[in-house]
Amino acid sequence: MKHKVTFEQDGFVRVPGFCDAEELQTIETALARFIAERVPALPVEDVFYEDKSDTCSLKQIQRMHEHDDFFAQLIEGKPKQLAEELLSGQVVCKNLQYFNKPPALGQATPPHQDGYYFMLEPCHAVTMWMALDPADEENGCVRYVRGSHTRGLRPHVRTNTLGFSQGINDYGSEYDCENETACPAQPGDLLAHHALTIHRADANQSTTRSRRALGFIFYGESAREDAEAHDIYQKHLAWEMAKVGKI
């Protein structure tokens, strides 16, 4: 319950050592296999590269649990249990993602609220981010605006950031700056935030270190998605990314 109290108060919670060394090694082995064997056959809209001609610039993979039994079991385990605690009830597993900020290539993640992308009523959802590499201020750790989940959805505008197509257009108020909190993480540490919590991350300034992570998204059972609007948005986004050679 301690995680739930912090989550409801701050809009996010840090869970150090969510996965231990043995669990991480199992995940790393499965991830390497997935990238080698599954990624080449995935739909183009599920795989993003900083530079499509360079496979080493892999930035995001979407819906991994729909393409592989290991990751389907992973999202149904400890992450789902935590989501049910944080949202006080049954949840729906929506996405298991891979994120990377490659050395010197990884762009900044614009300030945003996941709820803007989710298109839910009510906006009852949680996103989790589990570090696979050490994440710090040099390579772009996640930054949250404490308490922002209580202040509603902010206006968003189109961005040019791959994988984060919308960002808050008026970010930087006194409230934002005073309440922004950097959240460094070690491999296996997990961060969970409410769908209305504002968060961002700086670019990867390191020339040698990646900043890899897995993401888990869960909707509360009461949340209803505007499926038609979401589908139109996703199709248009895929068209735009294909046009500029990102997928």
Question: For each of these PLM feature ranges, what is it?
Answer:
Residues 109-116, 195-201, 216:
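Histidine-centered catalytic micro-motifs
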Residues 128, 193, 199-207:
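Short beta-strand His + acidic residue motifs that chelate non-heme Fe in jelly-roll/DSBH
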Residues 128-130, 209-223:
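A short hydrophobic beta-strand segment most commonly corresponding to one strand
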